[in-house]
């Protein structure tokens, strides 16, 4: 699909998506908003829980999670966009960076959930 001049992006701090009702309502809301890219922070997923995050029309879902139900970030890229992934860099729940291309134009998308204290120093280390 050819996209226009703009790419719509939504970013949300979801404060956990382990509850099925919250997850389903969130998925319905995202489908109605219809962005190209969605960033989620504070998903509270563990690596073994990521299969729970499903949205119709969004097969490209990338996570960074720790072993405890805290922090966690995700990047969702809509199927309506021809995004080609080159590299993915992530840690244990605070950031994920995806380098790729859209219509042969390089793009980098990053989702960072920094601690409340020392955020500038944390981000400079990423």
Regions found by a protein language model. Name each.
Residues 1-126:
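A shared catalytic/ligand-binding motif for oxyanion handling
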